[in-house]
Amino acid sequence: MAKKVQAYVKLQVAAGMANPSPPVGPALGQQGVNIMEFCKAFNAKTDSMEKGLPIPVVITVYADRSFTFVTKTPPAAVLLKKAAGIKSGSGKPNKDKVGTITRAQLQEIAQTKAADMTGADIEAMTRSIEGTARSMGLVVED
């Protein structure tokens, strides 16, 4: 018989930099999970990724206080900021443009995100990422 699920905990943790301080410690401590065990496992799984990149993670906590976790791809906004070389998006995206990004870069980001996105094809995913870019104040060039 399968283990009984106690809770699902969704967090964004920097790749390779999980530690017991907030947000990890309080979220997992509440559920009675061994925090250091999670930190070691997460850091081992994300050591091949760029350090400091925020990685969404879904932690499944079981009734016996054991856990499993699934890492997702970084948020599209983070990948767009990195590709455009900007620190943050525009406060007024329709008026103030903060940078430019090419369609090739958008397709590259869409392929990175393909595992997590439910789009029908790569073109649909690219258009979705393009919408995110525009809402951040980025100009899309062909």
Swiss-Prot record:
Processing after translation: One or more lysine residues are methylated.
What would be one Pfam family of this protein?
A: Ribosomal_L11
Per its UniProt record, what PROSITE patterns does this chain match?
Answer: RIBOSOMAL_L11 (PS00359)
Keyword list (alphabetical) reads: Methylation, Ribonucleoprotein, Ribosomal protein, RNA-binding, rRNA-binding
Q: Which GO BP annotation is one of this protein's?
A: translation
Q: Name one GO molecular function term.
A: large ribosomal subunit rRNA binding
Superkingdom of origin: Bacteria
Indicate the transmembrane segments per the record. Answer: none
Note the Gene3D superfamilies from the entry: Ribosomal protein L11, C-terminal domain, Ribosomal protein L11/L12, N-terminal domain
Q: Record's family?
A: Belongs to the universal ribosomal protein uL11 family.
Subunit arrangement?
A: Part of the ribosomal stalk of the 50S ribosomal subunit. Interacts with L10 and the large rRNA to form the base of the stalk. L10 forms an elongated spine to which L12 dimers bind in a sequential fashion forming a multimeric L10(L12)X complex.
What name does UniProt use for this protein?
Large ribosomal subunit protein uL11
* Species in which this protein is naturally found: Cronobacter sakazakii (strain ATCC BAA-894)
Tell me the gene name.
rplK
